[in-house]
Amino acid sequence: MQTFRRALLVAALLAIAAPGARGQSAPLNPANAKPFLGVWVIEMTEPAVFKGTHTIRVWDNGGTVAASLQTNPNFPAIEATGIHRDGNMLVLTLSHNAKPHPMMENGMPIWAVVSAVVDGNTMKVAQMLERSQTIKRGAGNRQN
């Protein structure tokens, strides 16, 4: 299982780096992201040491999909720098160029990849952080 998780993390990080090498893909159309649109409050439950509430917002930004991740209610949301749909999964990337600031860990900017799957009224999330072997997991419901 650990090997699978590492392979998933490597694949996700390659997906982040690959668009720069082969050119950007077309922006995601809101009609193709309809199940994901909204504000989702996610209770991160695994691993237990990282329990907490995250908010994922996905919206129609003038004909393209935009998204943000807020990991703490006391800090501003961070806008996703990459948004891709792969089958029933929405993949968000937050790079060192994220606005208003990149995600930080131990004072250093880090990349983050968030995969989300909507199952009925529930969004299931896995969050992978650069330089970490831990995959954070959680689930939550749409708030609007």
Enumerate the predicted regions with their spans.
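Bacterial N-terminal signal peptides that target proteins for export
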Residues: 1-9
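Bacterial N-terminal signal peptides
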Residues: 9-17
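Sec/Tat signal peptide C-region and signal peptidase I cleavage site
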Residues: 19-23
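Short, solvent-exposed mixed-charge patches
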Residues: 24, 141-144
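Central antiparallel beta-sheet cores of small beta-barrel/beta-sandwich binding domains
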Residues: 24-118, 126, 133-134
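A conserved amphipathic terminal alpha-helix motif
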Residues: 121-122, 144
